[in-house]
């Protein structure tokens, strides 16, 4: 059964495909070690939420999730949404990311990363992102803004 790429089902299926690609093709790679899981996607709001589990190896010296891990999870989530919104026909490397750490993210618990598209352009996509503990979804622990360069793999006709 075919469906439109730009639809609720199309978005969910494509994001799940990206996650499977990371887990299968990047075995041992950093993104695969983060092990993202799709929690929700909302085509109308142009946003998605991925879950990550804060493994003990992700700790900083204070015994909480390292800020670099949280930044990488935000980047990966915004980047996946950017690739989807670029119609999957290109790569969208990070051009800039700004991260604000508000509260610690505990280890050995799930945290959720929600990315929302603010601007989708021909050459740049911009997103906002928030990270929350899955047990306290109303308390943002981290916020981020990311800009992604849209590099088409082939020219539009």
Describe the function of each predicted region.
Residues 39, 100-102, 114-118, 132:
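Conserved positions in beta-strands of structured domains
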Residues 54-62, 70:
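A short interface-forming secondary-structure element
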Residues 1-16, 105-107, 118-157:
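HotDog/MaoC-like acyl-thioester-processing domains
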Residues 68-88:
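Active-site helix/loop of acyl-thioester processing domains in fatty-acid/polyketide metabolism
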Residues 81-112:
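Hydrophobic beta-strand-centered segment that forms part of the acyl-chain substrate-binding groove
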Residues 44, 55-58, 76-78, 107:
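Short, charged/polar surface micro-motifs in flexible loops or helix N-caps
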Residues 33, 45-49, 96, 110-112, ...:
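Intrinsic-disorder/low-complexity, polar/charged segments enriched in Ser/Thr/Lys/Arg/Asp/Glu/Gln
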Residues 1-51, 56:
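Non-catalytic linker/capping segments at the edges of enzyme domains
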